[in-house]
Amino acid sequence: MKHYSATLALLPLTLALFLPQAAHAHGSMETPPSRVYGCFLEGPENPKSAACKAAVAAGGTQALYDWNGVNQGNANGNHQAVVPDGQLCGAGKALFKGLNLARSDWPSTAIAPDASGNFQFVYKASAPHATRYFDFYITKDGYNPEKPLAWSDLEPAPFCSITSVKLENGTYRMNCPLPQGKTGKHVIYNVWQRSDSPEAFYACIDVSFSGAVANPWQALGNLRAQQDLPAGATVTLRLFDAQGRDAQRHSLTLAQGANGAKQWPLALAQKVNQDSTLVNIGVLDAYGAVSPVASSQDNQVYVRQAGYRFQVDIELPVEGGGEQPGGDGKVDFDYPQGLQQYDAGTVVRGADGKRYQCKPYPNSGWCKGWDLYYAPGKGMAWQDAWTLL
């Protein structure tokens, strides 16, 4: 069997390429996913939603590969001075102009408070840095998404401000009371201001308020299918606790007809929901029920307790029972030959003479990255992109 592991809660580290010091903090909202991170998860080269396709057409794919760099280096709390009206989602940077497109069909995430009245926001960060604050703003009632987002479209005060939070497993987890009286679709605007640097990060988060009074679930992220899978493939949802230990595993071998990109997430979700009371997959309704849908990206993974993360493993059947690709010692390229053709599963020979295989999406985008960081066996972050065979 050919084994792929798509880690949806832990994504590759992207290091700053323009600073002399070691690591430069980057990040974006993971739960609910920010606009840029959600489009990245759809696949930079072939996004699924019309809005993300339009963002790529307007600004190119690099903006999505750089999902954790929507920032201003000299903000120092003066956010309205460095991020102009109409450019909030792209932080005033030309690279991210596609995120500023004024349209009503940006994919949104349904959110609702838990039993204590809070919602847990999860921010994915690449390095621990001192935080001055995380501020959360919400659009005013009557906001028109078909007009460019301006500062005046936001409520004047943040509905939540976090000044002390610890980085755990690459994420900041923040419990916030949701704003009162909001219904339907809105944009949450998040600002992360560092205290050890004037740098700040910005994120537009498209949400819809479900109207649920008490939500018993914690959202971990979307279950996304990038492509159809062959019949006979096995997909496994793995749930890890706060210590990184396997808490649950749910496997399903796909039958013909249940292996399409819209069908296999539904089939896996139905099995998980039948077998587990801790984790459910689907779309949350106003009454706290999680129902699976036939979709490549709309199903969310929910747990009843905080502190978990998930991963989806995919095993593909090998025709004729042969070895996995690369098992015969052959390679597709001698690195860095054919660099722009590298994709998930590409096997290369590194400078050390060893064979490396490009990891599955979403890591596969880094296989084409700068050799200083992603040269197999040599780059500073090569293990984010490659598996040693």
From Swiss-Prot:
InterPro entries attached to this UniProt entry: Cellulose/chitin-bd_N, GbpA_2, GlcNAc_Chitin_IntDeg, Ig_E-set
PTM comment text: Can be detected in the extracellular supernatant as a 43 kDa protein and a 23 kDa protein, both proteins have the same N-terminus. Only the larger protein binds chitin, which may protect it from further processing and/or degradation by elastase (lasB). It is not clear whether the short form is functional or a degradation product.
Domain Chitin-binding type-4: 26-208
Subcellular location(s) of the protein: Secreted
Classification via SUPFAM superfamilies: E set domains
Highest taxon above the source species: Bacteria
GO BP field: protein secretion by the type II secretion system; protein transport by the Sec complex
Signal peptide: 1-25
Keyword Cell wall biogenesis/degradation: no
One GO MF term attached to the UniProt entry: chitin binding
A Gene Ontology term for the protein's cellular component: extracellular space
Main location: secreted
Keywords, in A-Z order: Chitin-binding, Secreted, Signal
Phenotype seen when the gene is deleted: Decreases chitin-binding, has no visible effect on extracellular staphylolytic or protease activity. Decreased association with the hyphae form of C.albicans strain SC5314; P.aeruginosa does not adhere to yeast form C.albicans.
PANTHER family: CHITIN-BINDING TYPE-4 DOMAIN-CONTAINING PROTEIN, GLCNAC-BINDING PROTEIN A
Job description of the protein: Binds chitin but does not hydrolyze it, has no detectable protease or staphylolytic activity.
Protein known as: Chitin-binding protein CbpD
